[in-house]
């Protein structure tokens, strides 16, 4: 079966998911419209989205290709191809807050037209089925930059990097909060910002890098449940056994912190669980802590195991979108590229959800990238891809999440 033809190019069909008046509206809000002359804000966003879809390696790559398809561009909301200098200047000087605002506005729009997209966007394979609450997975990822970014993103002695702190909704496998900063921002310091929008009754799961007992106590007061790993130097006193050891659960106890400062920061009791967990094919003892005193110890272990979903999320972005070669060196240009990468991701995820795509995200990306300028119905293209035989690979596994130049934690 061949894909059916369409009067629009695949690129136009993807870009059409962004509301027509949204980009001009945000350009006025952030003052970008005053900076635009021949290269409109819409043309700027389209060029960056195309750079993500084509996995472009640089400014010339994007500019040359867009000039070669100038006729098709004019049909996409009268956008125009940029000059190299004009594109570079726009990335460097136009307020990147517009790109961030655009991402959240488009995500909100997609949620409004299809509410089930956000609540059931994609069921992660390791999602603990016994939990009906919202599960928020929190982590950060370091994005390596070139040495030219040292003036604003110095990371260690001779390296530059940005860091993306992200809160992932495990029901939909979509981000619910993102903050992009230089890599010297410590995870624990960003924890309050990342968790600010979490509601009472929801669950937060994060690595021990985010452990700040002042913040953990604030979450307890707010009615938020949390699960994390215990640091090796945590001082505590066992108050009693919570439940008997069973299977991979070595110890389940109720404790009270005894550190000079931590006992003041977190005056209530909490749960400490020692368990054997499989890591990279080997059994390893891990220690978890939580403020929930009712769940089974195995459920708390399952919740932390679900945290590895965020590594799969970072892997999907790294393997498909362009977060290795950047189109500019200053902070503004880097932020434009990161936010348009996330924008492209949610557009493709929405297409995957609408088409009931059952293969990997990477295959969806490559299927559409190959016909980006063709006048084919993109859903028909994906339907044809789905006719191939063989075992369907649903999505990446956490143990495969090795990201060159994109370190998690």
Identify the residue ranges that each predicted region occupies.
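Phosphate-interacting basic helix/loop segments used at nucleotide- and nucleic-acid interfaces
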Residues: 116-119
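Single, function-defining residue in the core of a domain
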Residues: 1-61, 65-66, 92-94, 101-105, ...
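Extended, highly charged
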Residues: 96, 121
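Major-groove recognition helix of helix-turn-helix-like DNA-binding domains
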Residues: 75-94
